[in-house]
Amino acid sequence: MRPLSEKVAGIAPSATIEISNRAKKMQREGIDVISLSIGEPDFDTPKHITNACIDALNRGETHYAPSNGIPELLSAISDKITKENKFPCTPGQVIVTCGAKDAIYEGMEAVINPGDEVLLLTPAWVSYEPCVQMAGGKIVKHAVNQNTFQLDDSILERVNARTKMIVINSPSNPSGAVFDKKSMKLVADLCQDFDLYAMSDEIYEKMVYGKEHISLAGIGDMAERTITINGFSKAYAMTGWRLGYAVAPAAIIKEMSKVQQHSVSQATTFAMWGAVEALNGDQRCVEEMRAEFDRRRKFVISELNLMGYKTAPADGAFYAFVKVAGDDMAIATKWLEEGHVAATPGSAFYAPGWIRLSYATSMDRLKEALQRIKRVGGN
């Protein structure tokens, strides 16, 4: 038979999903594995959101909807962006997608031409590079400062005539770092000075602890060249709903819409009604989940530091990024096989020598996991 696609063959499987699947296999074999490897809140979706979805099903909201999203959700998103993220947004600048990952992929397809370079700040989430590759682009990596996890002027050395876009993620997966005003202004100045597009992944914006979340598009005229990525999975514990969105200039949204129309068509109609309630309804659930994540964060970071591990500034998201002595892949494997704790090696995020732990699980399980890590060792 003829060979399959070389483009897809060159893309590595998701390391985070691979580790999670391995842990689940051990669990099916009867082994008590504590999984700290996947970025998913352990809370159920709040009832007022699920009830809105059930109501939509009961009234027959089971048909095709506009490809970019139902008008009610587009309006709710544009209102939220204007009010909370502090840059003007109209419904015509929004597209609702099948998860934030889909928004990232569509955004890359809309902007990137074959041979274009995309500047990626590392450590970085595993799926940005494959999305760039599928769009025909090439990733150029730039490591943030390994002590502060902020940016400095050395990033200028990575820009050339082929650079088309920069991707940022604040709060960061995997490090939990939140970019400060200086770092964000540096990105904005870089884009304006070199005429670059920006993709700002802000999916963890509600999980910030004692810091300020800054939207890149709210700086100067950056809204004219920024694709802001967000969704409902993290803030509202709606991972399985597969609902994300992008906010961008109307010309970019038009191109993203073409990709969506000829692939997934639209996000699920009745699920979008749940998202309307998520944005327009009671927001106390978001703060309650954030407060619980903060409680776990303080405990996990404190315990790891007491064991002698260095950790990245955990000011956002729900991850502890841990510096280990030696091969992170080998240590993560040791933790899994000997301690039955699943964690993700930093090499998956272009950060060898680090390991990511998710504290999106119960306090009892976190306490047990840390005891196992302490027993097995690795620092």
What do the PLM-derived regions correspond to, one by one?
Residues R2-L4, A12-S14, I19-R22, M26-V33, ...:
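PLP-dependent class I/II
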Residues I38-P41, S67:
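Acidic/polar N-terminal loop/beta-strand segments that form early-domain functional surfaces
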Residues T45-Y64, S78, K83:
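Glycine-rich phosphate-binding segment of PLP-dependent enzymes
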Residues A52, A56, E72, A76-K80, ...:
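Generic beta-strand or strand-like secondary-structure segments
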Residues D32-G39, A56-G60:
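Glycine-/proline-rich flexible loop or hinge segments
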Residues Y64-T97:
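Conserved N-terminal alpha-helix of the aminotransferase class I/II PLP-enzyme fold
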Residues V8:
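Substrate/cofactor-recognition hotspot
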